[in-house]
């Protein structure tokens, strides 16, 4: 009986771990959410409400460590496609949208270290 309980516990933990790894956010979702931010990130001015909506959506989706790490990688990848991106505007964007994230928005952020 004890063996069966341990086996069941290990099985449940394995399913939970696999489910969280598979839950990573896609880069397409990140790029789509941040698309309304492109002009602001390169030219400044007022942050469009649709940009902040995307930032807030991404923040609410990135609940697990794999999700946050994937979101970080996708943000870095998406940032490379924004012509004339201003790194200062990018790093300050979450705060401008009233969002607190547990890592800096920067091309030098090591996404593997994000928890």
Swiss-Prot record:
InterPro entries for the chain: Bifun_inhib/LTP/seed_sf (IPR036312), Bifunc_inhib/LTP/seed_store (IPR016140), Plant_nsLTP (IPR000528)
Entry keyword set: Disulfide bond, Lipid-binding, Signal, Transport
Signal peptide: 1-23
Gene Ontology, cellular component aspect: apoplast
GO biological process, one term: lipid transport
Source taxon at top rank: Eukaryota
One function term, GO molecular function aspect: lipid binding
PROSITE patterns the record matches: PLANT_LTP (PS00597)
Disulfide bonds: 27-74, 37-51, 52-97, 72-111
Family per similarity comment: Belongs to the plant LTP family.
Function of the protein: Plant non-specific lipid-transfer proteins transfer phospholipids as well as galactolipids across membranes. May play a role in wax or cutin deposition in the cell walls of expanding epidermal cells and certain secretory tissues.
Protein name: Non-specific lipid-transfer protein 3
Source organism per UniProt: Arabidopsis thaliana
UniProt lineage: Eukaryota, Viridiplantae, Streptophyta, Embryophyta, Tracheophyta
Gene: LTP3
């Amino acid at each position: 009986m004890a063996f069966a309980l341990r086996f069941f516990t290990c099985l449940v933990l394995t399913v939970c771990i696999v489910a969280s790894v598979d839950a990573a956010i896609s880069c397409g979702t990140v790029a789509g959410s941040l698309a309304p931010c492109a002009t602001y990130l390169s030219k400044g001015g007022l942050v469009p409400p649709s940009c902040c909506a995307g930032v807030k959506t991404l923040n609410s989706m990135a609940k697990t460590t794999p999700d946050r790490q994937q979101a970080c990688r996708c943000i870095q990848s998406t940032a490379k496609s924004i012509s004339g991106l201003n790194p200062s505007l990018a790093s300050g964007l979450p705060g401008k949208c009233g969002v607190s994230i547990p890592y800096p928005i920067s091309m030098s952020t090591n996404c593997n270290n994000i928890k």
